[in-house]
Amino acid sequence: MGFSEHNLVWLDLEMTGLDPDTDRIIEIATLVTDSQLNILAEGPVLAVRQSEQALAAMDEWNTRTHGESGLIERVRASHLDEAAAEAETLAFLRRWVPERASPMCGNSICQDRRFLYRYMPRLEAWFHYRNLDVSTLKLLANRWHPEVLQGFSKKATHQALEDIRESVAELRHYRAHFLRLPAAGAEGGGAAD
């Protein structure tokens, strides 16, 4: 399967912190699935060059996590600024999904969207205005059926591509164990807007 308006674009960012007014994007990764969550393609995994000042401003958790993963050194070695990483990501996505067709998919994706709006506005605007946020299902499962959470664990490497793969796997888990969808073609199984 190739280019389709039904494909879903999954995205994850690693940042120097959580505040888009003071923190910066240091890694971006994307992948594309079909509507049934089969991975069709993995996009470029890009370390985004940032100043030493931005890296030095990271808190202890970010410094440790991104240092241990090797991301800080990849950021220092990167030749890509935010505009170049945005352009390369858009070039990949345009081969798979028409503009404004896919919701932005991922975990706590609103946070990523805030950073895209600030630092990669063309990429943020390329997505549909809706979000497919796996963390919503996690929160609901925790409140309504906590046993569902026991069947899935994440490595939480805080490496963008691995985090996206885990988000897709997590949504597959919730589809199988929490959403309990009727069989394909069953009454009431149509798509709603």
Swiss-Prot record:
Gene Ontology molecular function: any one: 3'-5'-RNA exonuclease activity
Disulfide bonds: none
Pfam (any one): RNase_T
Principal localisation: cytoplasm
Known EC number: 3.1.15.-
This protein's UniProt keywords: Cytoplasm, Exonuclease, Hydrolase, Nuclease
BP-aspect Gene Ontology terms: DNA metabolic process
UniProt keyword annotation of Transcription present: no
One GO term describing the cellular component: cytoplasm
Residue numbers annotated as active site: Y129
Residue intervals of the Exonuclease domain: 8-171
SUPFAM superfamilies (alphabetical): Ribonuclease H-like
Compartment(s): Cytoplasm
Known role: 3'-to-5' exoribonuclease specific for small oligoribonucleotides.
Family membership: Belongs to the oligoribonuclease family.
Cited PANTHER family: OLIGORIBONUCLEASE, MITOCHONDRIAL
Protein name: Oligoribonuclease
Organism: Alkalilimnicola ehrlichii (strain ATCC BAA-1101 / DSM 17681 / MLHE-1)
Organism ancestry: Bacteria, Pseudomonadati, Pseudomonadota, Gammaproteobacteria, Chromatiales
Gene that encodes it: orn
